[in-house]
Amino acid sequence: MNDVKSILLVGVGGQGTILASKILTQGLIENGYDVKMSEVHGMSQRSGSVSTQVRFGTKVYSPIIGEGTADILVSFEEMEAARYAHFLKKDGKAVVNTYRIPSMPILTGTRDYPDDIIGMLRQRVSTMALDATGIVEKVGNPKSANVVLLGALVKAMRLTDIDWNPIIAKTVKPAFIDVNRKAFAAGMAAV
């Protein structure tokens, strides 16, 4: 039986994709899963694409997620969801932040932001669109949208039996523990 689950987290540099992956990975390891993670930073310091592949289960041999094999795609920005959608299984799920960060070609007017990315995803897979950026403004720290999306992912993957509060406390800076716990809870509540 293949019990390995594959999660692809994608975003733009500075959105906290890697931190969310580290919290996820730490929680899974501490709860007995074999976990493999792979990061691709790209031009992350210049608002470029960042992706993290997390695979977990009883025994995982590789961190690499092939095209058409991801169980879930968590996108911190809409365009990144379109860019990585081909990695999802036919019965996969997408959790997408509706926040948009225009790329340089869009800013210069040489390209347009694609219309209805969420609609395109919904035609292919089960898609949960949420305004993680708006949700986190109510929590108090706009930089915690990554943890809102992590909370939504945990709920969507049915990993709610894990106590994530101590994991968050171990992984984020002490000054940001409370706001990240609130962001995580808000993400779970949004799904």
Residue ranges: model-predicted function:
Residues M1-V191:
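Active-site cofactor/cluster-binding pocket
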